[in-house]
UniProtKB/Swiss-Prot annotation:
Homodimer. The lineage of its organism: Bacteria, Pseudomonadati, Pseudomonadota, Gammaproteobacteria, Pasteurellales. Belongs to the shikimate dehydrogenase-like family. In vitro, is able to catalyze the NADP(+)-dependent oxidation of shikimate to 3-dehydroshikimate. However, has much lower activity than classical shikimate dehydrogenases AroE, indicating that shikimate may not be the biological substrate. Cannot utilize NAD(+) instead of NADP(+). Is not able to catalyze the oxidation of quinate. This is Shikimate dehydrogenase-like protein HI_0607. SUPFAM superfamilies: Aminoacid dehydrogenase-like, N-terminal domain, NAD(P)-binding Rossmann-fold domains. The gene is sdhL. It comes from Haemophilus influenzae (strain ATCC 51907 / DSM 11121 / KW20 / Rd). GO terms for cellular component: cytosol. It is an enzyme of class 1 (oxidoreductase).
């Protein structure tokens, strides 16, 4: 029951998603925590952040287009956010606002969890959205043989130069052990919902398929790779792990793997 001691966590986004709201509130309820999570939209990020501070809002998830523009209004930037100059999580400790990027944290942890070979050749397809978090995570995890393939030449070249990698505008004569999709290809409801993020022959010659598209849980890219016995890491794993990292920052509690899976399954029905 909501009362005077209930701690509020929130999200600020141009287009709020139900996933985070449902996921966090499910865990609060199951763990008996006096928290509530609510999504908000805003056009004024400066005053929204001032509101977070002034009203004692415990935590705030930040989505596009505010991940970079919110940074001047925060007190401390964690290395996870410094690594990509982008924030997706704010923690309010008695008026002191600390900023993190749990997307970056999640990808680093998934690289470690799946024991990805640092000597492997990697191709990242895409240069927008999650691309910076993905590329920085691979860079700071010790991967040197990474190339960025993007349809947008300008942003692809910029991202490659930013982290000291090569940009390629074609997959012809290329080969990689780890394939990472950071485009919207395969996304539910998108124009390319049924498409593969990489050519079939390319996937056949790879060892790992990594997709950041969260819905559906299994994109065509992931399904094709699984059918051929490849190691796969789904966007669903990314979105859940980054949300868990947020939850722990807000509450100082880490739910069990079973409860996390339960909350994620429930949240997907509301996505």
């Amino acid at each position: 029951m909501i009362n005077k001691d209930t701690q509020l966590c929130m999200s600020l986004s141009g287009r709020p998603s139900n996933f985070g709201t449902t996921f966090h509130n499910y865990l609060y309820d199951k763990l008996g925590l006096n928290f509530i999570y609510k999504a908000f939209t805003t056009q004024d990020i400066e005053h929204a952040i001032k509101g977070v501070r002034a009203l004692g809002i415990r935590g705030c998830a930040v989505s596009m287009p505010f991940k970079e523009t919110c940074m001047p209004f925060l007190d401390e930037i964690h290395p996870s956010a410094q690594a990509i100059e982008s924030v997706n999580t704010i923690v309010n400790d008695n008026g002191f606002l600390r900023a993190y990027n749990t997307d970056y944290i999640a990808i680093v942890k998934l690289i470690e969890k799946y024991h990805l070979n640092k000597n492997a050749k990697v191709i990242v397809h895409g240069s927008g959205g999650m691309a910076k978090a993905v590329v920085a995570a691979f860079k700071n995890s010790g991967f040197e043989k990474l190339k960025i393939y993007a349809r947008n030449v300008k942003t692809g070249q910029y991202l490659a130069a930013l982290y000291g990698y090569a940009y390629i505008n074609s997959l012809e004569n290329q080969q990689a052990d780890i394939l990472v999709n950071v485009t919207s290809i395969g996304m539910k409801g998108g124009k390319e919902e049924m498409d593969l993020a990489f050519p079939k022959a390319f996937i056949d010659n790879a060892s790992v398929a990594f997709d950041v598209v969260a819905m559906p849980v299994e994109t065509p890219f992931i399904r094709y790779a699984q059918a051929r016995g490849k190691q796969t890491i789904s966007g669903a794993a990314v979105i859940v792990l980054q949300a868990v990292e947020q939850f722990e920052l807000y509450t100082h509690q880490r739910p069990s793997d079973e409860l996390i899976a339960e909350a994620a399954a429930f949240a997907r029905t509301k996505f």
